[in-house]
Amino acid sequence: MIKLTEKIGYGFGDMASSMFWKLFGAYLMIFYTDVFGLPAAAVGTMFLITRIWDSVFDPIVGVAADRTQTRWGKFRPYLLWLAIPFAAIGVLTFMTPSFGQTGNLIYAYITYSLMMMVYSAINVPYASLHGVMSPLPQDRNTLSTYRMVFAYIGSFIALLLFMPMVRFFSGNSDELADQQHGWTMAIVVIAILCAILFYGCFAWTKERVKPIKEQQGSLKDDLRDLLHNKPWWILLGAGVSALVFNSIRDGATVYYFKYFIIEEAYANVSLFGVSFVLSGLYLAVGQAANIVGVILAAPLSNQIGKKRTYMGSMLIASVLSILFFWLDKTDLALIFTFQVFISICAGSIFPLLWSMYADCTDYSELKTGNRATGLIFSSSSMSQKFGWAIGTAITGWLLAFFGFQANTVQSEETISGIKMFLSFLPAVGTILSVVFIAFYPLSETKMKEITATLETKRKETNE
């Protein structure tokens, strides 16, 4: 039985990761186009190129983590070693040097690539930790819930407070230089908090599950085993598709409110002396609704199974996303209502995915004798990165295709394109995700059989 403090400690890790992840997803595109002055198409291409490399880098980290041996375990040490680099490179990513447009684009390539690599280097071991904290599927389901609740709490805090901090540090000035300073200082605050949370995760967690045999196989053997793991392939496709859905919606939200809703025409909402813009509230409401989805995932999956819960949630999100296109700019109540229900559906699927990845490690151990926890969980990060890369690249390219020009009034064609980013395009991702998960073979009954068999083998090995 895992103690409450350890569950909370594990949640701290994804709280830290998600603060940066959501800020990148929601604000990095518009930061590059409207604050740093880079062309939208160039940014889209950069996202795709850097994320493709980063997706390849994830399994390298997973293999290295599987072979790491320290007094702290295989995966926890990475939280200790990389918390500060994670924070520091995050700050560099949101800095705005003056190297000319070509030089600035090169700077963006370098800092963004480094950021995604250090994200992988800390997040892949963190995700893998989930698979070795307990051998019991019910414990891992609980850990998935804690992980995602804290992830969405972190996202909620970051999305709610980031733009108010930008305005505070910029002195409420609209001058570009002041805005650039505000963005950098706001990310400094978030980065410090992320480092503290990673240290908390390291201190409060413990690795318990040992493989039946120590890691002796070669990288070639590990990759061969992975490529023959059918559930892994299915989850990879489902994860990529789900992240395309999320990344397009998140990346286009600020454009939607800035250029279609014209949020400047509305008075900012003030709470406790802090002023919030509509786009920030919209994103934060989505994160709060995600938490509801996470909480509902466990009881729903216990009743009808993980697979049915996942498919049902994504199908509902598909229908609501398509209907979103026809909402008018004056339908703010409906826009926020749709955001709540779409986000509840989106929130419910990710704890299910993490739990399914943990099941894949058991399946791998049963079939090959090799858990390859880090390598398998690296695919979860890989699917995140690759799905996000595809989604943001599509956003950048289509913004250019529809004639987007930063900080000007947009044409009707551009506005129609921006509306598609929150409707038809995300729906494609949800539908593809449902198609993939329909073929997932590890039912609850099957996993009980696998768990019992592995427990017997572990006892025999330890005798």
Where are each of the predicted segments found?
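Membrane-embedded alpha-helical bundles of multi-pass transporters/translocases
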Residues: 1-463
